[in-house]
Amino acid sequence: MNVGRVVQVIGVVVDVEFEPGKVPPIYNALKIRSEDQDTPTEVPINLTLEVAQHLGNNRVRAVAMSSTDGLVRGMKVVDTGAPITVPVGRPVLGRLLNVLGEPIDGKGPVESDHYYPIHRPAPPLEEQSTRAEILETGIKVIDLLVPFLKGGKIGLFGGAGVGKTVIVMELINNIAKQHGGISVFAGVGERTREGNDLYHEMKEAGVLDKTIMVFGQMNEPPGVRLRVGLTGLTMAEYFRDEEGQDVLLFIDNIFRFTQAGSEVSALLGRMPSAVGYQPTLATEMGQLQERITSTRKGSITSVQAVYVPADDLTDPAPATTFAHLDATVVLSRQIAELGIYPAVDPLDSTSRILDPHIVGEEHYQVARGVQRVLQRYKELQDIIAILGMDELSDEDKLIVARARKLQRFLSQPFTVAEAFTGRPGKYVPVKETIRGFKEILEGKHDDIPETCFYMAGTIDEVVERARELEGSA
C-alpha cells in the first residue's frame, strides 16, 4: 500500500508527500480516511482527492472532491493506484449519484459488476459515425430553424433567467419520453432545487428507470463541479460502447465546468489567461467534448446549457464551447422581454444540418423564408420607431404584419411550465411546424389577428382561435 502524508492544505487543494519513487501519477485518486490515521480524528473523515500536479521533491498537489474540514498536516493519505472509478451499467439506472458514483437518493448502495475510470480517451477517428439525421423535439422554433442532429452536440446559450433550464427540462420531457432509450442528466454547478424538481418530475412521469442522474451542485467544491460532467459522460459511454445504445446526455450547465476549472487553476498556482480564465480552457473543454460523439456502435446526443456571462457571447467560456457544437440555440433577453417563450433568437441560432440535402428542400426554403421576413422586420424597426408605421410602403407593412405573426407563432406553451402559464403544453411534429409557417409566409392567414398566433401549438389551433374570436364578436 502506497501511503503519503499531508504537508499543506490550501482550501480545497491538498499537498501530499510520498516516499521517493512512489509518487502517484496525475489523475490518480487518493483517499484520506479516519480509520487509516494513527490518532483518532475529531470529525469522521472520508475524503477522495485527485492528483493534479507534481511539485517535485516527492510532493503532489491534489484537488479535494468534498470539504477539507478537519484535515491536519501529517495525516496519512492512501494512493488507490487508479483514477476515480464509477459504477456503470444497468444497476445505475434510476439512481441519483454524486461525482464519485455514490448514491445520494437514500436507496442503498449501487451493486454493479462494471466500473469505469472517469478519465478515458475519445473514440478514434475511424470509429466515428458520419450519418446525418434530424432529431425531432416537438418545439417549433428549434425543429424549424435549428434542427438537432441525432448523435450531435447541441448548445443552449443564454444569460441569467432567459429560460435555458426550462428548455432542457422540456427536451427531457419530449425526447426522453418519446425516445424510450437511456438518458443521463449531469447537473454541473446549478441549483439543488432544480435537480430535486427534475428528479420528482422524472419519477412521476415514469421515466426514472431509464435515467441516470449525476449531481455536483453550486454548493460543492470546485473539484466536484470540474469532474461531475465526466462522471455523467462515463456512464453514457458505457451504454454507447458496450450495449450499442443511442443515449441522450443532458448537461446543465457546461459554463460551471469552465468556472470550476478556473477556480482550481488559480488554486494550483497557474497564471490566468484572458478574462481570468485558466490557460488550459480549450484543452479541458476539448477533452470533455471530444468524448461526446457517435460511433458505429451507438450514439450520444448531448444537450448542453451554456450560461453566457453578462449576455456576452464573445466571453472565452461560451466562445470556446461554440467550436464543438453542431447546433447553437441562442436565447435572447430582448425576445424574453416581449413575453415570447421559448426566447430563441431565430436570426442568431444556427444548425449544421439546416441543409436541403438533409432536412429536405421544403423545410429549408420555409426556414430561410421565415428568417428573411424576420430580418427585414428587424431592419424596419428603426424606421418604425422614428417615423411610425404609416411611412412604410404597402409591401413593407405586409412584411411587418407577417413578421409579427411569425414571431408570435414561434412561441409555444411547454408541458414543464404548465404550472406557471396555466396552458397545457404542446408537442408539434416537424411536418405540422413546416405547414404552419409555410401558410403564414404564403399569406393564407393575413386576415387573422396576431394575438391568435401567440402561445399556440399548430396552425389549426390558430385558425380555431380566430373562429372563436369572430363568433364572440
Swiss-Prot record:
Enzyme class name: translocase
Residues where ATP binds: G158, G159, A160, G161, V162, G163, K164, T165
GO molecular function: ATP binding; ATP hydrolysis activity; proton-transporting ATP synthase activity, rotational mechanism
GO cellular component: plasma membrane; proton-transporting ATP synthase complex
Catalytic activity, reaction form: ATP + H2O + 4 H(+)(in) = ADP + phosphate + 5 H(+)(out)
Topology in membrane: Peripheral membrane protein
SMART domains assigned to the protein according to its UniProt record, in alphabetical order: AAA
Enzyme Commission number(s) from the entry: 7.1.2.2
Principal cellular location given in the protein's record: membrane
Keywords: ATP synthesis, ATP-binding, Cell membrane, CF(1), Hydrogen ion transport, Ion transport, Membrane, Nucleotide-binding, Translocase, Transport
Pfam family, one: ATP-synt_ab_N
Highest rank taxon of the organism: Bacteria
Compartments in which it is found: Cell membrane
Cited NCBIfam families: atpD
Function recorded in the entry: Produces ATP from ADP in the presence of a proton gradient across the membrane. The catalytic sites are hosted primarily by the beta subunits.
Subunit comment: F-type ATPases have 2 components, CF(1) - the catalytic core - and CF(0) - the membrane proton channel. CF(1) has five subunits: alpha(3), beta(3), gamma(1), delta(1), epsilon(1). CF(0) has three main subunits: a(1), b(2) and c(9-12). The alpha and beta chains form an alternating ring which encloses part of the gamma chain. CF(1) is attached to CF(0) by a central stalk formed by the gamma and epsilon chains, while a peripheral stalk is formed by the delta and b chains.
HAMAP family to which the protein is assigned, alphabetical: ATP_synth_beta_bact
Family the UniProt entry places it in: Belongs to the ATPase alpha/beta chains family.
Designated name of the protein: ATP synthase subunit beta
Species whose genome carries this gene: Carboxydothermus hydrogenoformans (strain ATCC BAA-161 / DSM 6008 / Z-2901)
Gene: atpD
